């Protein structure tokens, strides 16, 4: 277990930098991941994906498959990669505070 501190707030993360506790997610976490992923600004499109991922996780306890993410947000995979350069799993799920996906997200 590792710890990341950003703007005075500490987060426990796994070996890949994902939050250990979903309930620790907060705006400071988003800012931290945004900077570490090299994303300049969080747009409404970013927020739409984050909100969907969080809602899906709260209901199902897992991250959605990519096709479910695409179908429900209206974004093609290419567009998700444009928003989150490291992809839907590493970038989007991490920013949304989800644990590291085990499947194909």
Swiss-Prot record:
NCBIfam families named in the record: dsrC_tusE_dsvC
Species of the source: Nitratidesulfovibrio vulgaris (strain ATCC 29579 / DSM 644 / CCUG 34227 / NCIMB 8303 / VKM B-1760 / Hildenborough)
Cellular compartments per GO CC: cytoplasm
Assembly notes: Heterohexamer of two alpha, two beta and two gamma subunits.
Domain of life of the native organism: Bacteria
Swiss-Prot/TrEMBL GO biological process terms: tRNA wobble position uridine thiolation
Secretion signal span: none
Keyword Lipid biosynthesis recorded: no
Role played: Catalyzes the reduction of sulfite to sulfide. This is the terminal oxidation reaction in sulfate respiration, a process catalyzed by the sulfate-reducing bacteria.
Record's protein name: Sulfite reductase, dissimilatory-type subunit gamma
Gene that this polypeptide is encoded by: dsvC
């Amino acid at each position: 277990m590792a710890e990341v501190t950003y703007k005075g707030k500490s987060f426990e993360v796994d070996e890949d930098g994902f939050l250990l506790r979903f309930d620790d997610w907060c705006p400071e976490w988003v800012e931290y991941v945004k900077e570490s992923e090299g994303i300049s600004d969080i747009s409404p499109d970013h927020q739409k994906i984050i909100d969907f991922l969080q809602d899906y996780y709260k209901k199902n306890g897992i991250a959605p498959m990519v096709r479910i993410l695409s179908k429900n947000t209206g974004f093609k995979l290419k567009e998700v990669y444009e928003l989150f350069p490291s992809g839907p799993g590493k970038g989007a799920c991490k920013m949304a505070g989800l644990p590291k996906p085990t499947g194909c997200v």
